[in-house]
């Protein structure tokens, strides 16, 4: 399915569209952790014990902290670590820009590279078969690392590409001058086995069905283009098959229901360029969303760190 044609908008309308969304969010956001540069978190994940993992790209490391605990370094990397996800056994997988995918054993120890390549590796997700997928945001593609260790292109649909032109809010994404086009970003699977992909520059969610043989089906636009999805970054799913999106350049958290309808849950301070979300795992935390507040391109006065909000629906915390 091709993208709908994008109409230009006048600057006054653009600014009104961006600013008006701050009043739409109804869920309160609280602060869990405050950090300072270079320790600004881009991706976030939680394990079954409630330990939180953060990628700190400008410090070239991944750290973790238990509830109420201090930051502990998990591993350092040769370049910027972005996406962080855990498998059901607690092994930590990290997407490293220009390097590939790295794994840190659940029991601890040095990180080992399990897939290599020059992409802008970013979002990670496991399917129900245990295969690991990663987005190449710069190349606009999804790659798969299967259980045999084979690393291959899974989908190169044009819908996964980014752009250097203005997005759905009428503005160029703020990261484009530094990193170039940013297409496929956060990824997650719905209950039907379809992959949902955040397209950062275009403010879209792309749906890619999985064929019976595990190959990628034909990609289509599931939601957007929408100003409320501009800067769509990290994503996560709840048990009702809703997709949660950290819209970084909008400074907000969105919920996209199974029909593609977008609801703004939270916007404005303290959210500042939020880049990823993870559902809680502990007792009383299953409906909690933990947010990596990247603040690399500030959208408010909110400091970098970790924030928390309640989604009202239990999430899928692992993978």
Enumerate the predicted regions with their spans.
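Bacterial N-terminal signal peptides
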Residues: 10-20
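C-terminal region of N-terminal signal peptides and the immediate post-cleavage residues
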Residues: 18-29
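Beta-rich, blade/repeat-based domains predominating
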Residues: 35-52, 77-100, 117-132, 139-141, ...
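Short loop/turn segments immediately following the C-termini of beta-strands
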Residues: 57, 96-97, 137-138, 200-201, ...
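Short loop/turn segments that connect beta-strands within beta-propeller blades
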Residues: 65-70, 104-109, 145-150, 209-214, ...
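Blade-level signature of beta-propeller repeat domains, shared across WD40, Kelch, NHL, RCC1
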Residues: 278-319
């Amino acid at each position: 399915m091709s993208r709908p044609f994008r109409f230009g908008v006048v600057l006054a309308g653009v600014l009104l569209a961006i600013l008006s969304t701050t009043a739409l969010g109804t869920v309160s956001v609280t602060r869990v952790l405050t950090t300072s540069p270079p320790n600004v978190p881009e991706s976030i994940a939680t394990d079954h014990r409630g330990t939180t993992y953060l990628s700190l790209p400008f410090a070239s490391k991944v750290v973790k902290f238990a509830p109420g605990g201090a930051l502990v370094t998990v591993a350092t990397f040769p370049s910027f670590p972005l996406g962080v996800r855990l498998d059901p056994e607690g092994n930590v997988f990290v997407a490293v820009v220009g390097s590939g995918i790295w794994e840190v054993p659940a029991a601890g120890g040095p990180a080992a590279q399990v897939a290599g390549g020059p992409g802008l590796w970013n979002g990670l997700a496991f399917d129900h078969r245990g295969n690991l997928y990663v987005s190449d945001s710069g190349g606009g593609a999804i790659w798969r690392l299967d259980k045999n260790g084979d690393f291959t292109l899974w989908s190169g649909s044009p819908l996964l590409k980014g752009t250097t032109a203005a997005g759905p809010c009428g503005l160029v994404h703020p990261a484009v001058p530094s990193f170039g086009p940013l297409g496929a970003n956060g990824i997650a699977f719905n209950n039907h086995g379809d992959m949902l992909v955040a397209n950062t520059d275009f403010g879209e969610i792309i749906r890619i069905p999985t064929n019976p043989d595990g190959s990628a089906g034909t990609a289509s636009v599931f939601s957007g283009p929408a100003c409320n999805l501009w800067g769509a970054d990290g994503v996560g799913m709840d048990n009702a098959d809703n997709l949660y999106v950290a819209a970084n350049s909008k400074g907000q958290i969105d919920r996209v229901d199974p029909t593609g309808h977008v609801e703004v849950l939270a916007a404005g301070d303290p959210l500042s360029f939020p880049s990823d979300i993870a559902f809680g795992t502990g007792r009383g935390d299953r409906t909690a969303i933990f947010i990596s507040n990247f603040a690399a391109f500030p959208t408010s006065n909110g400091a970098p760190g970790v924030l928390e909000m309640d989604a009202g629906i239990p999430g899928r915390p692992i993978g």
